[in-house]
Amino acid sequence: MDKAKFIDVLSDSTGETAEKAVRAALLQYPDAGVQIRLHTRVRTPEVARPVLERAAQEGALVVFTVVSPELREFVHASTAELNIEAIDLIGSLIVRLGTFLDREPINLPSAMLPLSEEYFRRIEAVEFAVKSDDGKEPRNFKRADIVLVGVSRTSKTPLSTLLAQRGLKVANLPLVLGVPPPLELMEAPQDRVVGLTIGIDQLCEIRQARLRQLGMPSETNYAMREHVRQELDFANRLFAAHPEWPVVDVTKRAIEETAVIILEHLKERDERAKVVRSSLV
């Protein structure tokens, strides 16, 4: 049996940046079975040392984001002393930026920095996404930066949450077979509506898994292939009737990749709008 492998993520703040970077890199090693241990608000050598000693004992990889030069140097020295494989995710970047900008860094962990306008914008966007999930507030479609439209289990909610974390106000609407979308969708700016589609095989699998999770029988219309096909056909007819809506196929795509595609559509939309405005001047 293979020995368990650990990655200790050490941060003087929330550790979110480092953890996301590690998880993104681990996607290239599926089924690696690596366990990530997150150590947050590590701001003194006294707190860091036990983490590093345990990592040395267990042969763990240490990934760290530390802005304090003194603590960063301590971690570098300790990992060398203890013969630990370590990756400094942010230290060299801070130093190189200082050289490029000809300025000294303030050396404060992100959690200790003043709350910015962008922070409050993200909070507002997340609250908007929660209130506008699953078509709950159709009146919000007009206010949304993006309105995601698709049949059940096309990643509308996780996409809304992910995009909201970037400060975008996102609403989403589930398409139900035979039920026309609410008038509010047609009254919203049509270049903000994005259709989501998915392959029938994957959608059936996802829905069957969902039914098993809920302890429900799989022989229901929700997961039956013919019914699923009818739902997808219904959605595709709606998308075809609105060619101004970009349609994104989420089949076998991570939500992060789908989000990037949607953001690219937004960028193209904004660039077209700029061209139109400049032609009117």
Swiss-Prot record:
Keywords: Kinase, Nucleotide-binding, Serine/threonine-protein kinase, Transferase. Its EC number is 2.7.11.32, 2.7.4.27. It catalyses: N(tele)-phospho-L-histidyl/L-threonyl-[pyruvate, phosphate dikinase] + ADP = N(tele)-phospho-L-histidyl/O-phospho-L-threonyl-[pyruvate, phosphate dikinase] + AMP + H(+); N(tele)-phospho-L-histidyl/O-phospho-L-threonyl-[pyruvate, phosphate dikinase] + phosphate + H(+) = N(tele)-phospho-L-histidyl/L-threonyl-[pyruvate, phosphate dikinase] + diphosphate. NCBIfam families: PRK05339.1 (NF003742). Bifunctional serine/threonine kinase and phosphorylase involved in the regulation of the pyruvate, phosphate dikinase (PPDK) by catalyzing its phosphorylation/dephosphorylation. Belongs to the pyruvate, phosphate/water dikinase regulatory protein family. PDRP subfamily. PANTHER family: PYRUVATE, PHOSPHATE DIKINASE REGULATORY PROTEIN 1, CHLOROPLASTIC (PTHR31756:SF3). This is Putative pyruvate, phosphate dikinase regulatory protein. It comes from Sorangium cellulosum (strain So ce56).
